[in-house]
Amino acid sequence: ALEQEELEDKEEGLSEHPELAHLNQDQYEIDEVEDEMSKRSAIYGKIEIPDEKEMKEKTRTLDENQRKVVDIVVKYCRSVVKARQPGNSLPEPDHMMVHGAAGTGKSTVILLCAQWAQKTLVTAGSDLDKPLLLKTAFMGTAAANIGGQTLSSTFSMKFGNEYHGLGDRSRDLKRRAMENLQILIMDEISMVKADMVYQLDLILKEITQKHKKAYGGVMVMAFGDIFQLPPVLGRAPFREPQDSQYAMTHAIEPRWELLKVLNLEENHRQGEDREFADVLNRVRIVEKGKLSEEDLALLRTRVRPEGHKDLENASINIVC
């Protein structure tokens, strides 16, 4: 499917620039604000594009549901590129919630979606210092795992549920830095409270200046597992927000319901990790007191008394 679409695009003259070259900044006069904007743009990071053959090989290893997510992203990005031609209009964003338990390959899908989006959207004259796609997560560890940044640092989000808007200078810098933004990836969506979803909606509108478009016309891709614990001091992202500031928007067009749900179901882990992940996935959905004796026995093998030497090198300890 990807190969066929590439041939069609080449016929329309929409193939990407072979060098993916930066604009020649020497041609432009850069004032103080633009210089600071450029420095801040670098914070968002660049998405490295591997050899196309390698990308295609990795894509072929995806299961059916994983591939469906990547195909949606590629199709959307190709439509965005085609919309740059006279007479064509921008496509409506395919907002989605990619839901999957441990081991279903969410991180792999995020990586490939980012790479294919970058490869497809970058054409001759693209400014690679301005992100086309941003990878974010609620917590710093999760953000680092996907090569991204936290939501709060990316969009200068403040604590609390009320939306105060960006300062004049911050707004100007973000508008310049993110003027080419097409896709926003949010990992560990279960940690994002409902009010934060609506704050993000308003921030993106403020940045893109597309106030009538949900999420400012940016395609939002949420990844995670809603069976995990809800946000601390907040409602789950699919619930009604607490702050009355978002009540009308929630009543007319709930932002969560704009996300098309795509489920990743296949466990891709191997050996003991796969077996343990399967048990954890069953724990997520089983009724209280209904876990099998086999699953309980496996969980008991992971129990250690306080002070045990195994705890010294354990990355995560659960205490009860």
How would you name each of these model-derived features?
Residues A1-C320:
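Conserved ATP-binding/catalytic motifs of P-loop helicase motor domains
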